[in-house]
From Swiss-Prot:
Organism for this UniProt entry: Heliobacterium modesticaldum (strain ATCC 51547 / Ice1)
Function comment: Catalyzes the conversion of glucosamine-6-phosphate to glucosamine-1-phosphate.
Protein name: Phosphoglucosamine mutase
Binding-site positions, Mg(2+): 100, 256, 258, 260
Record note on modification: Activated by phosphorylation.
Amino acid sequence: MGKLFGTDGVRGVANSELTPELAFKLGRAGAYVLSKEAPQPRIVIGKDTRISGDMLEAALIAGITSVGGEALPVGVLPTPGIAYLTRKLKATAGVVISASHNPVADNGIKFFSASGFKLPDAVEEEIERYVLGEKGQSLDNVGGDAEGRHDDGLPAPTGALVGRVRPVADAETLFVEYLKSTVPVDFSGLKVVVDGANGAAYQVAPRILRELGAEVVTICCTPDGTNINDGCGSTHPEKLCEAVVAHGAHVGLAHDGDADRLIAVDEKGRIVDGDRIMVTCALHMKAKGQLPKDTVAVTVMSNMGLHLALKRAGIRILETKVGDRYVLEALLREGASFGGEQSGHILFLQHNTTGDGVLTGLQLLTVLKETGKPLSELAAQMEQLPQLLVNVRVKDKGCMNAPEAQAAVEAGKAKLAGRGRILVRPSGTEPLIRVMGEGPDPEELKQVVEAIADVFRRF
């Protein structure tokens, strides 16, 4: 990773780490790097519901237009919507302003290429070099010269060559209609509770389901700029579990702040995580002959039960590092199209280029309609081994390499040898060390994982 770009773009506390000045520089450098061959780059810009989104959007637009780019703001829309619209509108690039499932104080800036995919590391590194002044001069010096270039070496167009802002008024409808086109059935007779996390899906998700015939109950779909992910959404599905039972719904669908992930709840109020969603969809696609290469890509965080369920069905599994970008790389490399993460980032590459929580919900409901089976029965196709994940906040994620920490991890692995596993990794977006364990005995598993977590808590 670079100094600015992490596993999912640039993130930080808005107006403190991720400042308007930095957003301006990212917009300016990003538009230039991504559009060297375009006479006037066109950049789609979307955001979630965070209060800082407007501030950062204004700065990004200023940066984009300052190099002659055309800014196409689409307003509040899920991250995968930006990826889709970048392709649909034949734009040069797309930018999302969101920190996904992070707290409201955080925000982020992530770029998509013209094809709707996340940027390769090399391209992010080039943008970063311009922003940090490691390529030419620092972008702190923004005065132009007589030859139409700024002191940073980037274009300084004047007059009619300055970029324009052209809002896309029908952006939401374009995305909604596309998502509806991926569904071969209607959802009449289904009652669905949607938890929008007070985020980017708060309008889109309920609208699509209603237009497809479902009866929809919404919770946490009233954003006020400060309540995104606040005790709700895919990282806090407890309210959704209660609501599904209270309303007698067939299923609950929980998104995160930018709606690139989905966690479901069955009719009994039980959580159905990304692993079980993937097993449900993969087995259905395999039965219909619609699973390319009979292959699914998952990360090392996926439960061992997923491996057993898919292998029984003759499905090949590609295992990657944690992060949907690595799942994507594996799928593209192998010519496959389906995979994801236990956290609910799930990719259907035949439909979109990135994890899409709303799309995943539609595909899951399609399985319910086509099989006539309740979600509890479909999810039971995978027997989940006991798994425990503990997140430990640390000052320096480098503590993973400390001898004391490594000794604790090795001791834990030794205790579960042959019966389970331990996986310890740093978060790519937060100052956390994640300690995950799987094993047959929940009590023993808790003791082993907590012993490791206690060591990290000392750092």
